[in-house]
Amino acid sequence: MIEEAPIILCGFPSPAEDYREDVLDFNSYLDISRPSVYALRAKGFSMTGAGILPEDIVIVDKSKEAINGSLVVAAIDGYFTLKRLLIGKTIILHPENPDYEDIHLSSLEELTIFGVVTAIVRKL
């Protein structure tokens, strides 16, 4: 927990620069104290268009309902992936990088949605 999170302007100085926020609790801010929320480390480049880079920490909530357009952690026949869920006449797991192809799910494949991405954490 960070005891104090001062506000710092990235533009012109402000007379309000000495204003300070209350305690910044990342557990509360990212809503990670609930048992349905977990963190995963991203690997690969298929989701760079969604702002997810290798080594990012992806916060996932198992209790959220995945809807069309959600970023989801899914398992296809037991293999895990993070993609954008597109629901239409068929279900597509869409990578957010043009160098990667969509995953079109057939009726023979077993899809399990493990959770919806709610936040990304990245070190600079």
Predicted feature locations:
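Short, positionally conserved secondary-structure boundary motifs
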Residues: 1-48, 68, 79-80, 87-92, ...
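Structural motif
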Residues: 55-56, 70
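Hydrophobic beta-strand signal
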Residues: 59-60, 73
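Low-complexity, intrinsically disordered Gly/Pro/Thr-rich segments
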Residues: 96-107
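Flexible glycine-rich active-site/ligand-binding loops centered on an Asp-His dyad
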Residues: 110-111
